[in-house]
Regions:
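Conserved ABC ATPase signature
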Residues: 70-74, 78
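Conserved ABC ATPase "signature" region
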Residues: 51-66
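H-loop/switch region of ABC-family ATPase nucleotide-binding domains
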Residues: 131-132
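H-loop (His-switch) and adjacent beta-strand-loop-beta switch element
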Residues: 144-156
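ABC ATPase nucleotide-binding domains
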Residues: 162, 169-198
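Conserved catalytic motifs of ABC-family nucleotide-binding domains
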Residues: 91
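Catalytic Walker B motif of ABC-type/P-loop ATPase nucleotide-binding domains
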Residues: 95-99
Length: 198
């Protein structure tokens, strides 16, 4: 993910840059919650955005009503939605989400994952999701890359669940349970990284 974001340079292999339009939601963000920083202010901390762009992003993530509220007064789920709004404000081709539901209650997690799917569909952008939530990873993704200090395995969720390294990491039982998920969608992924409707 950090190579895709341009934070790290590749060590080996090749990386082909597809787009400069990448949105990012970090796992953790350090903010002094005592600062009088409103949702609107947060949206323009590092770049200028017009009012329409800000309102559109906050509306899409369902938090337009919070634009004048101090960030310190927001719940974990509300703050994640503001972070997501900031990440999609430039209509990215790729959205990198690092543990996007951390600090969010279970009901909020479900709502956030549904929102992420909606954003992907509406903006027609790819999602690179970093998560330790095996249920979500195996049930709601097209392609899984399993890391444990190195790439253990990658492929469709069903292929990964059958992989011996995956089984060694998570156990045969987890592999059998998670391999029951089938991801159905109305599109295909080309070798060039494009998505085409069936």
């Amino acid at each position: 993910a950090k190579i895709a974001l341009g934070i790290y340079k590749k060590i080996d292999g090749s990386v082909e840059k597809y787009t400069n339009k990448v949105g990012y939601v970090p796992q953790k963000m350090s903010i002094d919650w005592t600062l009088p920083l409103r949702g609107n202010d947060f949206m323009i901390l590092t770049e200028s955005l017009n009012k329409e762009t800000i309102d559109e992003a906050l509306s899409l993530t369902g938090v337009i009503h919070l634009k004048d509220k101090n960030l310190g007064d927001l719940s974990g789920g509300e703050f994640q939605r503001v972070l997501l709004a900031r990440a999609i404000s430039k209509k990215p081709d790729l959205l990198v989400l690092d543990e996007p539901v951390q600090g969010v209650d279970f009901t909020g997690e479900i709502a956030l994952y549904e929102l992420i799917k909606k954003i992907s569909d509406e903006l027609d952008c790819g999602i690179l999701l970093i998560s330790h939530d095996l249920h979500t990873v195996m049930s709601a993704t097209d392609h899984v890359v399993c890391l444990n200090g190195h790439v253990c395995c990658s492929g469709s969720p069903l292929d990964v669940a059958k992989n011996n390294e995956y089984k060694a990491l998570f156990g045969e039982q987890a592999s059998q349970i998670l391999s029951r998920y089938e991801h159905k969608h109305d599109h295909i992924h080309t070798d060039e990284g494009e998505i085409k409707k069936n």
